[in-house]
From Swiss-Prot:
UniProt keyword Flavoprotein, yes or no: yes
Pathway assignment: Cofactor metabolism; pyridoxal 5'-phosphate salvage; pyridoxal 5'-phosphate from pyridoxamine 5'-phosphate: step 1/1; Cofactor metabolism; pyridoxal 5'-phosphate salvage; pyridoxal 5'-phosphate from pyridoxine 5'-phosphate: step 1/1
UniProt-recorded name of the protein: Pyridoxine/pyridoxamine 5'-phosphate oxidase
Quaternary organization: Homodimer.
Any one GO biological process: pyridoxine biosynthetic process
Amino acid sequence: MTDLTSLRLSYTRAELRREDLNPDPLRQFQGWFEEAQQADLTEPYALQLATADAQGRPSVRTVLLRGADERGLTFYTNYESHKGHDLAANPQAEVLFYWAELERQVRAFGTVSRVPEAESNDYFHKRPRESQLAAHASTPQSAPVENRAALEAKFAALHEQFPEGTTIPRPAFWGGYRVQVQEWEFWQGRPNRMHDRFRYARDGDGWRLDRLMP
């Protein structure tokens, strides 16, 4: 294996100053997100979601952002998945967006709750038909499966159960979560590891903004 101690990059693309920041962290995030989209990055809406169970054992995985507004950050998943069980026992999470080409990172921490069923229904029926069937097929999510053939057979059976032209119902075990963000951090890589970091922390009805040591 390569000697990893010799591998490093120097970040020189941009700087981040206090006067550059929007006083509203959601607007700051939306601005950066739009820049990531305009930069034609691969899945800039992919985020790493970290949760922990009742005993504090952490786990992390990649999910897709499906909404970002005053209510919070929204994603969809199987409620019976590992993350679903974590969030039922410990309804808080941290998410991470890393846009390497922009040398930027955003962290957000908050409490998590399920979105209303009507909202989950609306999104489910906007998904490609094959993805709707896959939501039914991949349950119980994270459980062992004998082999790929068993999974494909289940998927094929669902194709027969819901032929083209029929409505596929959203399964009760699948839907959305929303992270109500209490803390944001914006990171811009800088030369010599002297990075720019700013944290927004909830302070009453507003936000306290601090520059952090890199």
